[in-house]
Amino acid sequence: MSERNAASARTVACLLGPTASGKTAAALALAARRPIEIVSVDSALVYRGMDIGTAKPTRDERAAVPHHLIDIVDPADAYSAAEFRADALRLVAQIAARGRTPLLAGGTMLYYRALTQGLNDLPAADPDVRATLDADAARDGWPALHARLAGIDPATAARLAPNDSQRIQRALEVYLLTGQPMSALLAAPPRDDDAAAGLRFVPVALEPSERAVLHARIAARFDAMLEAGFIDEVERLRRRDDLHLGLPSMRCVGYRQAWEYLDGCTDYRTMRDKGIFATRQLCKRQLTWLRAMPERIVVDCCAPDATVRAVDALERVLDGRAPA
């Protein structure tokens, strides 16, 4: 963004954080003080029928405060970062035009990165390249492809799990098609004529001062999901002929582990432990993304008054009192 555009840009507050950091509570608390509308930055919340395992805001919460980009895609379909970016920019403009305040809230850092920095004309998916990578993975395993990625794009590999097949494949595909690492392409600044050029995104990040506290929350939340009927939710999805574990929706944390349990591949205790471990790994990757944002305003999500602190930080951003 040029200095001229930066001076005239409209500030957009963003509430980011890992799983179980208290984003929903803080967003709803802010909504009690200001006329906000929440734009979800969460790749799992877009899917219909996936409510318990994604910790989707309740009907009452969504009735009290307008939420956007939730329940917009069938689990059999894909939803890309490019689609999110276009939808989010449109919604930010529409919400502001109504005289209300948009609040971006979520934990899908790739979406946030795409929104704020653009996609820089990343190439479209190439079926032939993907088929080759799938064959390589079938022969060598995704950890081997992750190691390959680390050799050409260490920054991207560092934030991906060795079995994150979808993102490893995409990062390798981008490199094979462009000859450039995805991290370099994403780091390029957006053009001044980009739709986001008139916006200044300011992230407030909920981060743990004590990792063990967040881990305990993750375990408690996963157990609460199980008690709320998560296995039944996955069983309903599993009965659909058009859903399978290769889909992005079924790669969401917890869903794969529950599906494998229903397939008889693991017992209940192992499923629970794997679900909690996968969530902790997701949290680790989310924090890696956040800590690469020097402009963020950090709020300790482990503090007893974390919600109050987060609301105060967001109000400072919206009132123009946050650091430039």
From Swiss-Prot:
EC number, UniProt record: 2.5.1.75
Keywords: ATP-binding, Magnesium, Nucleotide-binding, Transferase, tRNA processing
UniProt entry tagged with the keyword Metal-binding: no
Region (Interaction with substrate tRNA): 42-45, 166-170, 251-256
Site (Interaction with substrate tRNA): T108, R130
Keyword DNA-binding (UniProt): no
Xref: InterPro entries: Dimethylallyltransferase, IPT, P-loop_NTPase
GO terms, molecular function: ATP binding; tRNA dimethylallyltransferase activity
Binding residues for ATP: G17, P18, T19, A20, S21, G22, K23, T24
SUPFAM superfamilies tied to this protein: P-loop containing nucleoside triphosphate hydrolases
Cofactor(s), by name: Mg(2+)
Domain of life, source organism: Bacteria
Annotated GO biological process: tRNA modification
Positions with a binding annotation for substrate: T19, A20, S21, G22, K23, T24
Catalysed transformations (reactions): adenosine(37) in tRNA + dimethylallyl diphosphate = N(6)-dimethylallyladenosine(37) in tRNA + diphosphate
UniProt xrefs under NCBIfam families: miaA
Recorded family membership: Belongs to the IPP transferase family.
Function summary: Catalyzes the transfer of a dimethylallyl group onto the adenine at position 37 in tRNAs that read codons beginning with uridine, leading to the formation of N6-(dimethylallyl)adenosine (i(6)A).
Oligomer status and interactors: Monomer.
Protein name: tRNA dimethylallyltransferase
Species assigned in the record: Burkholderia pseudomallei (strain K96243)
Gene: miaA
